[in-house]
Amino acid sequence: MAGAKEIKTKIASVKNTQKITSAMEMVAASKMRRAQERMAASRPYAESMRKVIGHVAQGSLEYKHPYLEVREAKRVGYIVVATDRGLCGGLNVNLFKKVLLDLKNWKEQGAEVEFCPIGARSVQFFKSFGGTMPAHASGLGDAPSIADLIGTVRVMLKAYNEGKLDRLFIVFNKFVNTMTQAPVIEQLLPLPKSEEVANKHPWDYIYEPDPKVLLDTLLVRYIESQVYQGVVENIASEQAARMVAMKAATDNAGELINDLQLVYNKARQAAITQELSEIVSGASAV
């Protein structure tokens, strides 16, 4: 059994760690609330854009934009949104597992794959994994703007426009609630037709003055808004996962302190018993 002094030092060390994890839990909770506010503010715009684009994809247009045309999938691109920092449980691991599973299906069909990682952990993972990375972004912070993402997104759009990509997906952790964050893969290009719209009478549009100019601007703005929403959702998911992970670490530290305190008490008791035995033995010898 370790000595009482050694155990006491270990208890002090665990208590210091517990203070750190408790502080990180509170910081994550505060950041999560702010991230939720940003997510709630941008979600209606992203969903409205998705609805409008769903109608556009379903409608019969005189001008057929390249983003509406489905072509054979020979090259597939993934925009993978992960975190810049760790200590958020299995959030990134679960996301990467989902990407690799989907990637396996495309490779079995003979498709080539490119990655556009967003977030330091995503960049690090795909550098070690291998594969083509035409663009990446990291260090966006807790409150990125859409301007921080435009350059990265447009590299992937340019590749699609030039025929270097036939499919483009975004992968991120969708914030469901504080305890649940679900990794999702959403198709960006070609524009997916809305199932909801398919079951209803589709809208018809009259474009003024020129459908090409309008759609070129609208569809690029749509892609940018969906990527931005994915990043915002992932940040909220990151802070929620970190808060839960730090709470678990704090609780575990408390249990460890209690266990060590019991060991310390037993060590103290054994030391006192030994001292008393030595005193009694000495007195008997005299």
From Swiss-Prot:
GO BP terms: namely: proton motive force-driven plasma membrane ATP synthesis
Q: Which UniProt keywords apply?
A: ATP synthesis, Cell inner membrane, Cell membrane, CF(1), Hydrogen ion transport, Ion transport, Membrane, Transport
**Annotated GO MF terms:** ATP binding; proton-transporting ATP synthase activity, rotational mechanism
Q: Which domain of life is it from?
A: Bacteria
Checking NCBIfam families in the record gives: ATPsyn_F1gamma, PRK05621.1-1
- Give the protein's biological function: Produces ATP from ADP in the presence of a proton gradient across the membrane. The gamma chain is believed to be important in regulating ATPase activity and the flow of protons through the CF(0) complex.
Q: Please give the family membership noted in the entry.
A: Belongs to the ATPase gamma chain family.
**What does the subunit section of this Swiss-Prot or TrEMBL entry state?**
F-type ATPases have 2 components, CF(1) - the catalytic core - and CF(0) - the membrane proton channel. CF(1) has five subunits: alpha(3), beta(3), gamma(1), delta(1), epsilon(1). CF(0) has three main subunits: a, b and c.
- Protein known as: ATP synthase gamma chain
Q: What is the lineage of its organism?
A: Bacteria, Pseudomonadati, Pseudomonadota, Gammaproteobacteria, Alteromonadales
